[in-house]
Regions:
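Alpha-helical transmembrane bundles and membrane-interface segments of multipass inner-membrane proteins
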Residues: 1-157
Length: 157
């Protein structure tokens, strides 16, 4: 029971934490083209930006926003069911931690797609390679990537 509470709390922490950051970015970082919309963090290793992603990862599907939103909602719903089923079983905390990270990120990005009609991305890596430097992420993206890895490792046990 304690583990279930911890994992549900993790989902909520990711969702509300990322939502708070996204709202702050929308409020305080100017839109691209309307002033300085990039701030350096950690000595320039990270860049804080404001980017509206109307598709999926790397803006894929941006011309089919409705389809992207429906797929996002459907996958999030399935993931929610799998997550709650996993909470009813003993053991395999690695799988549950991965699912919690995935679900927190999925809730946040799906919420954006449905509410704002775009996902707010705000972090880039301050590297010399322009291909990587121009990609903009958010906390939920990192949680989804790490969560998928942990869930896969947890399923391999």
């Amino acid at each position: 029971m304690v583990a279930a509470i911890i994992f549900v709390t993790l989902v909520l922490f990711i969702f509300f934490g990322d939502l708070y950051i996204k709202n702050q970015v929308e409020k305080y970082i100017p839109a691209k083209g309307s002033g300085k919309n990039e701030r350096e963090l950690l000595g320039g290793r990270l860049l804080l930006r404001r980017h509206h992603n109307r598709g999926m990862m790397l803006n894929a599907g941006e011309k089919k926003q409705s389809a992207v939103a429906v797929v996002s909602l459907a996958l999030t719903a399935v993931l929610t069911v799998v997550f709650f089923i996993s909470l009813g079983h003993w053991g395999n905390n690695l799988l549950r931690a991965g699912l919690a990270l995935l679900l927190g990120g999925a809730f946040s990005n799906t919420y954006d797609r449905l509410k704002r009609k775009y996902v707010v991305d705000y972090l880039s890596f301050g590297v010399k390679w322009k291909g990587l430097r121009k990609i903009v992420f958010n906390l939920s993206d990192f949680c989804i990537i790490i969560g998928a890895l942990l869930a896969a490792l947890g399923m391999a046990d």
